[in-house]
């Protein structure tokens, strides 16, 4: 059923995710919400948002582990944002700007935006 909904809407919400009242998705294409994600009430998210897990070292226990973020109440997450990791908590009344990449918790009543992008090259 989940795969059918994903193919029709472009939204991938794992059936194990916990979602509060008055959850709103605008322009849902590309949204991914992982299995252990917890979303509070009155949360709005836009296209291309990922609430996902961080990569793990080989052999780490994953079953039953909290791998995805917790989102508080009255949070807005704009397009292209990625919020990753089971220890990442976005507290209440936070606005997450577009194209941000978050792997640490964000305190309540905060606005998060991306700085001017710069290319970083890795020498092989």
Enumerate the language-model features and the residues they cover.
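Terminal amphipathic alpha-helical/low-complexity segments used for targeting or macromolecular assembly
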Residues: 1-9, 124
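Left-handed beta-helix
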Residues: 9, 14-15, 20-21, 26-35, ...
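Extended hydrophobic/aromatic segments used for targeting, binding, or gating
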Residues: 55-66
């Amino acid at each position: 059923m989940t795969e059918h909904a994903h193919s029709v809407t472009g939204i991938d919400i794992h059936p194990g995710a916990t979602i509060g009242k008055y959850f709103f998705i605008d322009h849902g294409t590309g949204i991914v919400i992982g299995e252990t994600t917890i979303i509070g009430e009155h949360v709005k998210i836009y296209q291309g948002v990922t609430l996902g897990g961080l990569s793990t070292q080989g052999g780490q226990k994953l079953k039953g582990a909290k791998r995805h973020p917790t989102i508080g109440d009255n949070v807005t997450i704009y397009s292209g944002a990625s919020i990753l990791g089971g220890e990442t908590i976005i507290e209440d009344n936070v606005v997450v700007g577009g194209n941000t990449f978050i792997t640490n918790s964000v305190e309540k009543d905060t606005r998060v935006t991306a700085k001017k992008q710069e290319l970083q090259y890795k020498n092989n």
